[in-house]
């Protein structure tokens, strides 16, 4: 029997009025740094101001003060999110054709922006159907609003106003919790309490209230909409909530109230809490009754999880105990000391959260098309492509951010004197083995995946199709992926006997869902072409990981620069007199990792865009014949590099290149402008600091001659600043180019 010491009572931990609110201080640029607050001597000042404004570590070394600043900043972030959401809902209320779309979502496109007619700009307002002229939007908000049961633009207005109120509330909270009642450090470090509140409150009660909204508001309203009832005739949300008889007409078991729940006769509720699988043939989205059931189940899980950790009462898990008990026969001290790292280094904490959130965002990207959650989402090809692309980019950036903050943790917060033989120390001690093996994997994947394509290009060029790797010659079938697909396709009759269809139509079988003559989803065939491009995915992902992981593991020291930790997170080179030590800082690894992340995600979204147009999206005739947008050319065309260039990039760019004079012309201009932004980045990436400093001094001389020289001395960008500006424009230009290319294409043909 273990006798524990009595648990200390947890007190409310805040400091009252710790920092006075001062607008004078606020208006003084760089008030957080003695050097920057002096004002500008050279133009470098403005760059340092931006670089350090949010680097709270550089303002103070007091962890409590840093924690308070981060906490307060989070409220500011939430305020901006509410403001953005309010703007989206306001556009839906004021400038959109939402009510018209709701009455006929298969023939009318969503639009929530009308361009003012200045010198011919009204050309941008295309006809989206139903006599409405505007810009077709691809954010998926209309589908989301329909799923939540919004039936009028007035409801959107009210929600927009509500979001503004919340934005103001968040701004107030950010000020209040920094200036009036700021939490003490112990409050930020009380992980069990935080877990309980986030799990039970945010995720548990959040999911439960959403499930409640779906059952009492969304389901009945959507049932009416699916039956073709005019939105104006449907009772309002509060009528369903207040009047049980209304719901009982649609779902008879509602008449029994909570009796079946307390008598454990839960199957009574299976009218509106279903387990069907597959898609609703009317809307092409997941069954909303399945979604409500899912949120109820998730809520139960998180409500239970939110009661697992030990706080004021002496029962439940302690995170420190769990981590310290977590050691195996080959892992030394295991996770001993990890608790201290995660409660004193917010960079370490943020790194883990970014890695998990980034991975989750990419999982969301895939689920949005494989299991389209909202009504009429699957047949809105522009929105499907946009949602996939958006979530892939966001996921990529978050994962690079995880590596960035892991490296900052290593440089600023890691204390090697207190860490011995725990898992992190063991990883650091055999980092050479890890990185060299990972490097070997990258070389193997790169040569072999690219080599398969080069072989195909060569055979194709020489007129020897029978010697190519393809579904019709030398087959390289993705047998493991096909096996997984098949297993899931058979699951409803075997491992999931309660389900009537598999989780996603993409797995296989002979189901096809079409809405209004357009394919929503069908089984996605995988073949040699997918096998080839998946190995390119493996290659680009592994190289990205190699660069980022090397940056983290060698952030403090390396054979080349043993004292790297003293140089900080970002530095250009190891001082003058030591050649060959440039681009070794942890920051530089993040910089280089961003380019490979861009490579990796680009291949993924290109693959997705072409695959869906070739093998999934299209129209279906009355006889049941499916005609795909690009006629199934992916399997034979994408197996050569030339095929990617000719049949994807060039063939599908015709819409954006020929968009002038049409409502898509803005995409043509963006395509051009984004190429320019991308090319502009090369000026920063391919030139050194000295070149620009020389040029600047010549220009300053001319200004002096004319007596118009500024008081602030102009300076060339530092090496790091130049790289930062370069990578920013590279990514912005590349992503915006892809965006214009994708949207002009899919809006024209989809």
From Swiss-Prot:
Tagged with keyword Flavoprotein: no
Pfam families named among the record's database cross-references: PsaA_PsaB
Membrane topology annotation: Multi-pass membrane protein
GO cellular component terms attached to this protein's record: chloroplast thylakoid membrane; photosystem I
Binding site for phylloquinone: 692
Annotated Gene3D superfamilies: Photosystem I PsaA/PsaB
Residue sites binding [4Fe-4S] cluster per the record: 573, 582
Keywords from the UniProt entry: 4Fe-4S, Chlorophyll, Chloroplast, Chromophore, Electron transport, Iron, Iron-sulfur, Magnesium, Membrane, Metal-binding, Oxidoreductase, Photosynthesis, Photosystem I, Plastid, Thylakoid, Transmembrane, Transmembrane helix, Transport
Cofactor note: P700 is a chlorophyll a/chlorophyll a' dimer, A0 is one or more chlorophyll a, A1 is one or both phylloquinones and FX is a shared 4Fe-4S iron-sulfur center.
Documented EC number(s): 1.97.1.12
Localization, UniProt: Plastid, Chloroplast thylakoid membrane
Role played: PsaA and PsaB bind P700, the primary electron donor of photosystem I (PSI), as well as the electron acceptors A0, A1 and FX. PSI is a plastocyanin-ferredoxin oxidoreductase, converting photonic excitation into a charge separation, which transfers an electron from the donor P700 chlorophyll pair to the spectroscopically characterized acceptors A0, A1, FX, FA and FB in turn. Oxidized P700 is reduced on the lumenal side of the thylakoid membrane by plastocyanin.
Subunit record text: The PsaA/B heterodimer binds the P700 chlorophyll special pair and subsequent electron acceptors. PSI consists of a core antenna complex that captures photons, and an electron transfer chain that converts photonic excitation into a charge separation. The eukaryotic PSI reaction center is composed of at least 11 subunits.
Family as reported in the entry's similarity comment: Belongs to the PsaA/PsaB family.
Descriptive protein name: Photosystem I P700 chlorophyll a apoprotein A1
Originating gene: psaA
